[in-house]
Regions:
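Residues that mark the start of a beta-strand
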Residues: 7, 35-38, 249-251, 277, ...
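C-terminal and late-domain segments of enzyme folds
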Residues: 112, 247-248, 260-272, 277-279, ...
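Internal gly/pro-rich beta-alpha loop/helix module
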Residues: 129-244
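Phosphate-binding active sites in nucleotide-utilizing proteins
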Residues: 249-325
């Protein structure tokens, strides 16, 4: 008998309606009922999937209509929904918001149709009554091909407010009204400059998860939602496993702490499948790199918030610089790239010493300096692949390089274009150390993971020859 699961996409009419809180609450309520929940997030965001993982006990996975193809998204969904009872997909922005005004590309609606899942539409009822029915009717009719599981009102002023909304909805909207939740600011997730606080900074306690679950159960007809969701059979996918012999396996150190926490789990899975043993370490707390490494992966995060502590850890900075100079492959993205540079200047103008693998100083600004999807074409051989190989990712940061022009001998490794085109030189490689502001999703080019592991394997062989 084929195992079936149920799946739902949680979407909002627009950003700020409480979509993340509702998604987390739904995941928590389902788990409190004893159901295994597979969490997903539409878009390139790192923070929401971290909270999903805290609530569900399963890694939060990203689905994305630009970084990844339709087939890749469907494959990831099938692979990571397998074994769960319910898959919950948190949308991005408003339901129909995508890359442009002319079509659905990149939208939550597009992803829902790609996956064949119905939508639970979250609507903020604050300041609205009968007008809410007009709003929902517009969303319902905008794309007849999209299936709606129901509507959930958030931020009700009172239970009487919900009665008013129910009367209006029954007259004008086909999608079932599955409930409404009273305004509760205590449940809002705290934010900082890159969005919500990370799961590491604002860890949801077991008590907080139960509060979220109780909040959802108090106003959402979860029994009806589950009963009405169709049973789906996840598509068969090839298992991701490692067939590399132990003699060819390599150890890659992955930086994991409050300063470096932004990784797509699928990137790590692909590295493991290519033959890497992943060993976590903390540039903040550890004095030395783990023993026996053949490569390093330093992801993004918030080095600017921990710059003094990172600078004070001289031993770790020295270890990383020596590993880089010795030819160990080192790959760093965004915050990790900032850490590999010579210095980091914070918002107060204070300059902190970093690793020095690259000669640059990066400077924090009080505004975004870059945001958007990126396509990377490699201009020559790199530790992620050869000349003209292409991968996709995302860029989102408040810093930049302040002295790039002084270091013209440092060649760029990428030609980077945005979703709408335009080329810029970016990415920096010195020997086998590669750093960039772009967060790549390796599923857009799985060969990147294989190439990085291959570079680490070459490092291992060189070391073995020196020692032998």
């Amino acid at each position: 008998v084929e195992r079936t699961i149920k799946g739902i996409v949680v979407a909002g009419t627009h950003s700020g309606v409480g979509k993340t809180t509702m998604s987390l609450g739904l995941m928590a309520a389902l788990r409190c009922r004893g159901l295994a929940v597979a969490p997903f997030k539409v878009g390139p965001d790192f923070i929401d999937p971290g909270h999903h993982a805290k609530v569900t006990g399963r890694a939060g996975r990203n689905l994305d209509g630009w970084m990844l193809s339709r087939e890749a998204n469907r494959d990831l969904f099938a692979r990571h929904a397998a074994g769960a009872d319910v898959a919950v997909v948190e949308g991005v922005m408003g339901l129909y918001d995508g890359y442009g005004g002319g079509d659905e590309a990149g939208s939550t609606a597009q992803m829902a149709k790609w996956l064949g899942l119905p939508v639970l539409l979250v609507v903020s009822a604050a300041g609205m009554a009968r007008s809410a029915a007009a709003l929902v009717q517009g969303f319902e009719r905008f794309d007849p091909a999209l299936a709606f599981a129901g509507v959930l009102f958030n931020r009700l002023g009172s239970r009487g407010h919900l009665d008013y909304l129910r009367e209006a909805m029954s007259a004008y909207v086909d999608a079932p009204l599955l409930g409404g939740l009273l305004r509760d600011e205590a449940l809002a997730m705290p934010e900082r400059h890159l969005g919500l606080m990370t799961a590491g900074e604002h860890a949801l306690s077991e008590a907080a998860c139960h509060r979220l679950a109780d909040h959802i159960e108090s106003g959402l007809d979860l029994d009806r939602l589950l009963a009405d969701l169709p049973d789906i059979v996840p598509a068969d996918v090839e298992p991701v496993g490692c067939s590399i012999s132990c003699f060819e396996r390599v150890r890659i150190g992955v930086a994991r702490d409050e300063a470096f926490c932004f990784y797509y789990p699928d990137n790590l899975d692909l590295l493991a499948a290519a033959g890497a043993e992943l060993v976590t370490f903390s540039p903040l707390a550890d004095n030395r790199l783990p023993e026996g490494l053949h490569g390093l992966y330093i992801g993004g995060g918030y080095p600017e918030l921990h710059a003094a502590e990172l600078a004070a850890n001289d031993a770790m900075r020295r270890d990383i610089l020596e590993a880089s100079r010795a030819g160990m492959p080192v790959y760093a993205e965004c915050g990790g790239f900032m850490y590999l540079c010579r210095e980091l200047e914070d918002l107060a103008g204070e300059v902190h010493a970093m690793c020095g693998c690259f000669p640059f100083r990066t400077r924090m600004h009080g505004r975004l300096t870059s945001l958007g999807y990126r396509e990377v074409r490699m201009t020559g051989p790199t530790i992620l692949g050869g000349k003209d190989e292409v991968a996709r990712g995302h860029e989102f940061h408040y810093s930049d390089i302040v002295d790039r022009h002084q270091w013209s001998p440092i060649a760029t490794a990428y030609q980077v274009s945005g979703r709408s085109g335009g080329l810029a030189a970016e990415g920096y490689q010195v020997d086998r150390t590669l750093g960039s502001y772009v967060h790549l999703h390796f599923v857009s080019r799985p060969d990147c993971a294989a190439a990085l592991v291959s570079s680490c394997r070459a490092c291992r062989r060189e070391r073995d020859q020196e020692e032998g």
